[in-house]
């Protein structure tokens, strides 16, 4: 398994920390390969416990039947699911150290998670119905008026289920990269955090800003997933 470049001060390997981030941001970019051409699909995935997986986790979801991803030979080798990024540009003007020596340059901060595993296809109506029930429960839970599958006419729902195919990824490895200026001084990191907080125009900028406030130059590998605020480096 060839892993992406991850500086030690940015990488997060604690499974539960990564799982919490994935649960909060379930829309994945699912990258598969047919041996010739890579394919990227946006697919909501639910992370579930699975004792049979190397990490104890699996991702479940579904794709349109018209999507060739699920057909035999369209997903050779490992599949990669990426979650995020929550991101924001970082201006060097936000660093207090700029006024001291000007040895600063722009960068980008972000929160992103990756999961690798073997993709399995489940073209079974009962299995797919179960996945839809779990996804619906996760997405609708906590809403004042949650939608439930039983609210839809049975014949309509049965017809819709014939148009999708279930997928499952047994997760072999899962890690995140939280690039939150943790290698810089506390003053520079907090300066960047405050700069991002004043703009809040990047995707996930508020959450990123919160993460930067939680980070320190000595701790990111087990950094907690933060509240709904966004920010990047």
Where are these regions (language model features)?
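Binding-site signature for planar aromatic cofactors or substrates
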Residues: 1-233
